[in-house]
Amino acid sequence: MDLKEQDYYSIIQRKFVELFESKGCKAYLEITANKRFSNKLKSKISDYRHIIFYFLKDVAPDITGFFEKGSFTDFVIIEVKDEEIKLDHIYQVRKYADLFEAKFALLVSTKEIPAEIKALSKVVYPVLSAPSIYQGRTLVYFDGETQSFKDWYPENPFEKELYWQ
């Protein structure tokens, strides 16, 4: 069975909710590839930041949401690609991350992460950098056959305690 990109959304959404819950967080993720955001999601955006939705009318992350731990609420955006990751995909995810001030921006591909992208991120540091050490910008290889995450670059944020303190 050949799956299309949108067929992966709910699978990946569920997998990430499980990962956030494994870190003791309450997670809410919704599929937003249709450029529609629920009132529940919008209610977590500060009033002064609602202007971001003007810029999301034409393009939006595939999956958008937030997670709560204690009194903190942080945003997460997930972009899914059923093709090899390209540099333009990374900048697309960065744009969404900046608009939402996302703690985590994840670019998930059903193809292995290209060695060239990994090499580029080592010589052009800003490619995967985040505004803060407490924010993660991560490339992820999702194996559709086993329905599992196989590779995280530069690191798996769910295994780094710095993000969860």
Language model features with spans:
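Nuclease catalytic cores
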Residues: 1-30
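Intrinsically disordered, low-complexity terminal regions enriched in charged/polar residues
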Residues: 3, 7-10, 121-165
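Active-site metal-binding core of divalent-cation-utilizing nuclease and nuclease-like domains
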Residues: 26-74, 85, 147-162
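Well-ordered alpha-helical segments embedded in enzymatic catalytic cores
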Residues: 62, 91-92
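N-terminal cationic-hydrophobic initiation segments that often serve targeting/anchoring roles
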Residues: 68, 97-98
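Conserved beta3 VAIK motif of the Hanks protein kinase fold
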Residues: 78
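Nucleic-acid nuclease catalytic cores
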Residues: 84-85, 89, 98-143
